[in-house]
Amino acid sequence: MAPAPPPAASFTPAEVQRRLAAGACWVRRGASLYDLTSFVRHHPGGEQLLLARAGQDISADLDGPPHRHSDNARRWLEQYYVGELRADPQDPTENGAVASAETQKTDPALEPQFKVVDWDKDLVDWQKPLLWQVGHLGEKYDEWVHQPVARPIRLFHSDLIEAFSKTVWYSVPIIWVPLVLYLSWSYYRTLTQDNIRLFASLTREYSMMMPESVFIGLFVLGMLFWTFVEYVIHRFLFHMKPPSNSHYLIMLHFVMHGQHHKAPFDGSRLVFPPVPASLVIAFFYVFLRLILPETVGGIIFAGGLLGYVLYDMTHYYLHFGSPHKGSYLYNMKAHHVKHHFEYQKSGFGISTKLWDYFFHTLIPEEAHPKMQ
């Protein structure tokens, strides 16, 4: 017979208040207590919205307005469970509130799904690297990978390979912005010093001179081109569903994007590591050089590379930043978090919703009335 699980910790209202006074952000759902201190800065609605509810019952907030929290959001909450609220025999004035909390009921149909997360009973062993394990999940992989967890991930046994699979956010501008500046300067000089003609390889008679002013247009075109690449890769490659009988395609999907959906707040896996990024960037450079005149392709590539840098920085900020309510980034953060927690088959734009509008993959608006 398996040993009985240890009893849940319990806290009196006075103990909860002491933690709140020390700066912690505890909330409750009925009599269940959750320590959201480490999650406050990640909350898609902003820090202040969560801090304003410290010490309060959030049961009604989970159902909205402004929106009803998804099943994944409720599972996520359970990872922060710390115990139960209990009466204090030394302070009978608080016991009425405790009794009220204990009698509050949650949806009985949902309650069994959202018990305290038991890492020992998950489909994988979290004490070991995950990559080889996920390939064995088969038909269970797709559901498992879209149930996010609040913990870091290890992919490989080898420390060296593991190091190449992660990076810090600031490696992206440090490595790629100098290359953007160099390419931009180099190709701009080519425009000013050489007689660059468009379509010269096809016909000399109808070829056109390229003035210096075309640089800005081509550079911006490259940035726009990146937003399209971002959308296409995210939708059709990262969100492909690997065959359940293919061990290696499941592993490939997990390396490319599944790991990010499983652990969306693992900061070391939010931006593209330099080594694999170099291979992808080199591919696009060669591709543009092959299909376009060298200078044209080079300028578009430089703009696209800057677009990639802005995309990766935006992506990191959407996960870890706290944009002002009503701002562009605030709306993009809410949009992206919904993609992670509820709408994995829509909302593929990260730096812009442009292509979601164009291809009709916008996340639907909720019908809840606006908060006053």
From Swiss-Prot:
A Pfam cross-reference name: Cyt-b5
Function: FA2H is stereospecific for the production of (R)-2-hydroxy fatty acids. Plays an essential role in the synthesis of galactosphingolipids of the myelin sheath. Responsible for the synthesis of sphingolipids and glycosphingolipids involved in the formation of epidermal lamellar bodies critical for skin permeability barrier.
Gene Ontology terms describing biological process: central nervous system myelin maintenance; ceramide biosynthetic process; establishment of skin barrier; fatty acid biosynthetic process; fatty acid metabolic process; galactosylceramide biosynthetic process; glucosylceramide biosynthetic process; lipid modification
Residues binding heme, per UniProt: H43, H69
Cofactor(s) listed: Zn(2+)
Effect of F348L: In strain: C57BL/6J
SMART domains linked: Cyt-b5
Membrane topology, as annotated: Multi-pass membrane protein
Tissue: Expressed in brain (at protein level). Detected in cerebellum and forebrain. Expression in the white matter is mainly restricted in oligodendrocytes. Expressed in stomach, kidney, skin and testis. Expressed in sebaceous gland.
Residues the record lists as binding Zn(2+) 1: H234, H239, H257, H261, H339
Membrane spanning stretches: 168-188, 213-233, 268-288, 290-310
Stated family: Belongs to the sterol desaturase family. SCS7 subfamily.
Keywords: Endoplasmic reticulum, Fatty acid biosynthesis, Fatty acid metabolism, Heme, Iron, Lipid biosynthesis, Lipid metabolism, Membrane, Metal-binding, Microsome, Oxidoreductase, Sphingolipid metabolism, Transmembrane, Transmembrane helix, Zinc
GO molecular function: 4-hydroxysphinganine ceramide fatty acyl 2-hydroxylase activity; fatty acid 2-hydroxylase activity; free fatty acid 2-hydroxylase activity; heme binding; iron ion binding
Effect annotated for changing T103I: In strain: C57BL/6J
Annotated domain remarks: The histidine box domains may contain the active site and/or be involved in metal ion binding.
Entry protein name: Fatty acid 2-hydroxylase
EC annotation from Swiss-Prot or TrEMBL: 1.14.18.-
Reactions catalysed: a 1,2-saturated fatty acid + 2 Fe(II)-[cytochrome b5] + O2 + 2 H(+) = a (R)-2-hydroxy fatty acid + 2 Fe(III)-[cytochrome b5] + H2O; hexadecanoate + 2 Fe(II)-[cytochrome b5] + O2 + 2 H(+) = (R)-2-hydroxyhexadecanoate + 2 Fe(III)-[cytochrome b5] + H2O; octadecanoate + 2 Fe(II)-[cytochrome b5] + O2 + 2 H(+) = (R)-2-hydroxyoctadecanoate + 2 Fe(III)-[cytochrome b5] + H2O; docosanoate + 2 Fe(II)-[cytochrome b5] + O2 + 2 H(+) = 2-hydroxydocosanoate + 2 Fe(III)-[cytochrome b5] + H2O
Fatty acid hydroxylase domain: residues covered: 219-361
Cofactor note: Binds 2 Zn(2+) ions per subunit that likely form a catalytic dimetal center.
